[in-house]
Swiss-Prot record:
SUPFAM superfamilies: Restriction endonuclease-like (SSF52980). The lineage of its organism: Archaea, Methanobacteriati, Methanobacteriota, Methanomada group, Methanococci. This is Uncharacterized protein MJ1664.
């Protein structure tokens, strides 16, 4: 992912010994936050964003009561209005690849999760990792909560063994105890999720294209031990 800096974001720097992490953080009151919160709450908009280039599917009105279809139409209008507002400051927003959009989805999902649970946490995205001034890798998301640090890697594809080992390697270099691999796809590896956690201290958060918000938040509560 390129160093995409969004409007009103501030640069954040963190040091781990000789290593420096440099990323971005923003408040939760902008239109991007509102849009991604809508995609978190409604799978219809999440799939439109990540799978269909923001094109909404037709509403099957014959199978739903009129008041429900009217509410969907109202939400559809709000969804499209938010996109139009975002494009005023970020004209290429709808041209972002699905992987970048998924990283932003996870970023704002974490912000909303901590907000709803009234938890003070630091969430930083799109971090460069450098050693003695030389950038050698990047981290999608970094979370500092309850005195613990978590690294999130976001995949708009199936999680591979290489992804697990790469994340584990970064964790060992920075001496960070916990990692999370978040994916839009299901996890079908040879090892079970619990075995991966026992071996590497890495949580698998999968099928995020199709999970309801309450299910995602339940899994996040398990990850952060809330």
């Amino acid at each position: 992912m390129n160093k995409l800096k969004l409007k009103n974001e501030k640069e954040v720097r963190i040091k781990f010994g000789e290593y420096k992490l440099t990323g971005f953080s923003s408040d939760n009151g902008n239109n991007l936050y509102k849009l991604f919160n809508l995609t978190l709450s409604k799978i219809r908009y999440r799939k439109a964003m990540l799978e269909h280039n923001f094109q909404l599917p037709k509403i099957k009105e014959s199978h739903k009561p009129k008041e429900i279809t009217e509410k969907i139409k109202e939400n559809d209008i709000y969804f499209l209005e938010l996109i139009n507002e975002i494009k005023k400051d970020f004209k290429d927003f709808c041209s972002l690849d699905a992987g970048t959009l998924f990283e932003l989805f996870m970023y704002y999902t974490l912000i909303e999760f901590f907000k709803e649970n009234n938890i003070d946490a630091k969430v930083i995205r799109n971090l460069d990792v450098s050693y003695k001034g030389n950038i050698f890798t990047e981290i999608d998301l970094f979370v500092d909560v309850f005195g613990k640090n978590f690294i999130f890697e976001c995949k708009n594809r199936h999680i591979s063994s290489n992804a697990i080992l790469k994340l584990y390697g970064i964790m060992k270099i920075l001496n960070i105890n916990f990692g999370v691999l978040a994916s839009t796809k299901g996890f079908y590896g040879n090892l079970k999720k619990e075995d991966i956690f026992k071996e590497y201290n890495i949580y698998i958060l999968d099928k995020l294209i199709e999970k309801e918000k309450n299910k995602i938040f339940k899994e996040l509560k398990d990850i952060f031990n809330i």
